[in-house]
Amino acid sequence: RHFDWDGRLAPTNLATDAEILAVASVVDEVGVGVIQVGGDQALGKQIAEVSGRPVFYGNITQQAVAPDRWRSRLAEAEEMLRRGHRAYQFVMPRPGDLRYTLKTAQHFDALPSWKTVMLMSLDDRKEAFRDPATRAKLHFEAVETPLNPENAGEFSRRWDLQFVFQPALAKNENLTGKSIAQIAEEQGKDVLDVFLDLALEEDLETEFERREVNSDEEAMSVLLNSPHTIIGQSDGGAHVVFRTDYSYSTYLLSHWVRDRGIMSLEEAIRKLTFIPASLFGLLDRGLVRPGMVA
């Protein structure tokens, strides 16, 4: 949900679908402009149908919680374009790595006991993490309970994809780059005990990293090369506590072009410049041509 500078909900949070579709239906009369829709894919497709303008209605990711869901999302994008609608989904070239500490983590919020603990003061939170009864509840939710893959925001239970990114204490530097599952196996401990014990030892300053999104490079190669997707989807620094996405263009050029060779340099430049410029109606840029913006 988004708010304006005065703390009021943005109009799009309050408008009905009918009102949004009514506004979208006259955008094409102006002859310029694009529409972005976040979250509601069904509404995004309806807007594409009534507006006649380019619509960006989400992003396709490869996710550990549902490893093959991207295939149906890509087929959906292809079908929309076949029907003549300029409806596109973004693909982020970077892995969706999120770095966090147990002072700031949000990705346990769909688990009720975790959410309760994470809303506590830091001192109370540390006491809760130490409490055996509370830890048993946290273990039940984050280790024992099966994942619901339909809940996109739910913690994956993939402790092999939760890594120690930066320990706070020099004595724990040897854990850098190891997954919680790997450390648990090496120490003969439960994954949750490893996770919480390390965080508590370092006063919740341990920086972890979750690598659950866009980690399958074969799937990503298909998505990035698809003519039905648009490369992009930086958050512009909105979640800088957890990640910074502004490097997506250089990551495409360095990792995917130079290191992996999944497309030519020329094609990558076209996908980063000419294609988005054309879709956004910026017709004076995107090509190296006399009179165009450099």
Per-range role (PLM):
Residues 2-27, 37-261:
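Active-site neighborhoods of metal-dependent hydrolases
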